[in-house]
Amino acid sequence: MSRIDTPAASRMQTIARNPVMIALVMTLALAGCASKKNLPNDAAGLGLGAGAATPGSQQDFTVNVGDRIFFDTDSTSIRADAQATLDRQAQWLAKYPNYGITIEGHADERGTREYNLALGARRAAATRDYLVSRGVPGNRMRTISYGKEKPVAVCDDISCWSQNRRAVTVLGGAGS
């Protein structure tokens, strides 16, 4: 076996013969892989990386509060899980009073266009009414219905339909 005589090869041979150097290199390599960045709002655990939500932003509202609620088939009743989300929205809107919102009502693909536009309007209105009951001024909100025109899931089964029966709260509507 021939020996390579270059400065880099010489350094590698020195490191390879020194067990302390091997241990140091391995420790540094493992420590670099195992470190977890210290991010605000426990963003490291949420997979958000360096782009963690800025308080008071649309991203903050969406990620930390929740921007949508879901409805049962052919219903405008606010479910218990939706009430919890809307309560958080009302608290957030009280904390950031400069924002107005638009509440978008949606429906699944079943039914006529006209029926689903009306259903989406009733869902948006029910959402608005709930927020008003929690202290959000009505003049900070507007509603719109998209009916079945803007599905988030497109397929022909109940799992898709349930995702499309929703009301979405978007910052920047009335009053902002």
Swiss-Prot record:
PROSITE patterns recorded: OMPA_1, OMPA_2, PROKAR_LIPOPROTEIN
Compartments where found: Cell outer membrane
Signal peptide range in chain numbering: 1-32
Pfam families reported in the protein's UniProt record: OmpA
InterPro entries found in the cross-reference section: Bact_OuterMem_StrucFunc, OMP_bac, OmpA-like, OMPA-like_CS, OmpA-like_sf, Pal, Pal_lipo_C
Protein name per its UniProtKB record: Peptidoglycan-associated lipoprotein
Domain OmpA-like intervals: 58-175
PANTHER family: LIPOPROTEIN YIAD-RELATED, STATOR ELEMENT OF FLAGELLAR MOTOR COMPLEX
CDD domains: OmpA_C-like
UniProtKB keywords: Cell cycle, Cell division, Cell outer membrane, Lipoprotein, Membrane, Palmitate, Signal
Lipid attachment points (S-diacylglycerol cysteine): C33
Disulfide-bonded cysteines: none
